[in-house]
Amino acid sequence: MPKRKSPENTEGKDGSKVTKQEPTRRSARLSAKPAPPKPEPKPRKTSAKKEPAAKVSKGVKGKKEEKQEAGKEGTAAPSENGDTKTEEAQKTESVANEGE
């Protein structure tokens, strides 16, 4: 394996191939304008936490539609956790407050 030639020994015919000098000149496009300053990021607004919408179980589509219709009409559909009772109580209280 041949030995490397040192950069000091560039007098030979292969001297220019051995040493690769870095260019000292920059392109006109890069040197013409400085790098633009980075704009500061705008502070994000922190909104109040919104309560998630009521979750509907993913069941049969027909049942889902029936439950929504029953809720819209105001019929007293039986509820597992008693939500309909509390909703009716709130409605009666709001009606009583309006009358006063």
UniProtKB/Swiss-Prot annotation:
The keyword Phosphoprotein applies. Keywords: Chromatin regulator, DNA-binding, Nucleus, Phosphoprotein. This is High mobility group nucleosome-binding domain-containing protein 3. Belongs to the HMGN family. Its main location: nucleus. Interacts with the ligand binding domain of the thyroid receptor (TR) (in vitro). Requires the presence of thyroid hormone for its interaction. Interacts with transcriptional regulator SEHBP. Interacts with nucleosomes. GO terms for biological process: chromatin organization. It comes from Bos taurus. GO terms for molecular function: chromatin binding; nucleosomal DNA binding. Expressed at similar levels in mature oocytes and 2-4 cell embryos, but at higher levels in 8-16 cell embryos, morulae and blastocysts. Residues 1-25, 39-53, 62-72, 82-91 have a biased composition (Basic and acidic residues). It is found in: Nucleus. GO terms for cellular component: chromatin; nucleus.
